[in-house]
Design a protein with these regions (language model features):
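Residue-level recognition of strand-loop junctions within catalytic nucleotide-signaling folds
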Residues: 29, 68-72, 89, 111-112
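Short catalytic/binding micro-motifs of nucleotide second-messenger systems
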Residues: 5-6, 49-54, 86-98, 130
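Conserved long alpha-helical elements within nucleotide-processing catalytic cores of c-di-GMP signaling
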Residues: 2-15, 22-49, 58-62, 66-67, ...
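Catalytic-core segments of nucleotide cyclases and related cyclic-nucleotide turnover enzymes
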Residues: 74, 78-82, 96, 109-140
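A short pre-motif secondary-structure segment
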Residues: 56-59, 100
């Protein structure tokens, strides 16, 4: 999808973000895998509601999600992801009489017309990792 966008919009910029649920293993280990599945579904629902056709989000693997933010520069993509981050922090979760909350860490990068999509994804992933190393629950732009 991203490659098709680049081909059809060679002069357009876009943002890429990768989000990861903080301590997701703890959710599974503490409350069970059904609760973990519920968490992924609720988070997906929130992401899709916020996207509302403005950008694309998909599960990237495990508890990671990838966001494709067309026609946005780094600052604009970062602002969108700050809003997503804030929405997740406010999202109440209730499963089988358990009330709990989650946080996410997000790495945001921008396509710079020189790099391949893989390079941009790698840079976003490195920013995500830096956010994890420096305390989690943040957006690294």
């Amino acid at each position: 999808m991203i490659e098709a966008y680049r081909k059809n919009n060679p002069e357009s910029q876009f943002g890429i973000a990768i989000a990861d649920i903080d301590f997701f293993k703890k959710v599974n280990d503490t409350y069970g895998h059904n609760c973990g599945d519920f968490t992924l579904k609720e988070l997906s629902r929130l992401f899709l509601e916020r996207a509302a056709g403005k950008y694309t989000v998909c599960r990237w693997g495990g508890e990671e999600f990838c966001f494709f933010l067309p026609d946005l520069n780094l600052d604009q993509a970062g602002a969108v992801m700050q809003d997503v981050h804030a929405a997740v922090r406010k999202m109440p979760l209730h499963f089988a009489d358990i009330d709990y909350a989650i946080t996410i860490t997000i790495g945001v990068e921008e396509y710079d017309f020189k790099s391949t999509t893989d390079v941009v994804l790698d840079r976003a992933d490195r920013k995500l990792y830096m956010g994890k190393v420096h305390g989690r629950d943040q957006v690294v732009i």
